Amino acid sequence: RDMEPDVIFFSDAGPGVRWVGNERGVAGETNWNTITPDTLFAGKAGIEKLLNTGSENGTHWIPAEVDVSIRKGWFYHAEEDSLVKTPQQLFDLYLTSVGRGSTLLLNVPPDRRGLVHENDVAALEGFRALLDSTFKTDFALNKKVIASSYRGNSKHYAPANLTDNNASTYWTTDDEILTGNFE
């Protein structure tokens, strides 16, 4: 961290992100971004379920990273050119990773030319089209939001900021309020 203070370390126990416990591209249906890493270490047997779900009352914020390859394996093999995941399969992986609060690390290996193979490119373009069409409408945009409280009752921190499509506005509570909710 001395040389790169913003580095994110990856391992079973974090400290930045944790392995999700499989290489299928699937986070647990319930996936807490918190976990208690005290007894975890890389390669420890029998912790896959814990890594896949995290801990509701975990002591550290260590979100899961889901890793999967667009192909059967991690490296390019010409005989797998017809086995590239389809756009729909990639979209399903997105929903079972990002849709469950994880990051998605999608391996796309270069071919023997040092390029991304045409079949992989086509699958990625189809995946992008599915994402764009699925999420083109922001159903929360400018909807009314009610919150338990907001800082100083100031419009600068009001719940309406959650749906105003402005990345520089936000909702927050007063400093002494440690939990809050909105609907």
Protein language model features and the residues they cover:
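Mature catalytic domains of secreted/periplasmic carbohydrate-active enzymes
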Residues: 1-161, 166-178
